[in-house]
């Protein structure tokens, strides 16, 4: 299906540019007495607690895991970039570099997900990409960064005008119109819907906005080079 869509872009002289971000938790292979999931304990023995978003210590606690993950991704040609700790204990996100090959970018995301799970097992923990593994903690999502380049390599969505580029408006309108059908792919499980709640950085309506993390389709603001 994606291949046919890309062919239609190619026929119009356009190239989709794509990157995928996947949030995940590192959790203990043991379970609590009630069967609930427990956060992973790093080699140093410190149990993560509280919101530790963007914390460096949280990354350093699991440094052996991340070192092996980066090495494995490099060996398989996966363009892994920055790593951050997220909004809950043991939750992380690593970014894959943008590619002017949407099909390969999606394949990279699938391969990366398998690698994360395999490397986690090697370090005695488990990685879960479940949308809502903890009822009282942040959910995990997948962010897809999309732009479209013309034949000269220029982003047709970019514009310095306050109202933005017309092509961007059409793209957003099309995605909003198809978001209902998209749930079959983007929220395929009962657990997926546990993440959709107000004030949780998960969208609860077919909306869009500029630099607004609560909407379904976010237009990031940035310098012209971005």
Which residues does each predicted region cover?
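Glycine-rich, acidic/polar active-site loops that bind/position phosphate-bearing ligands
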Residues: 1-226
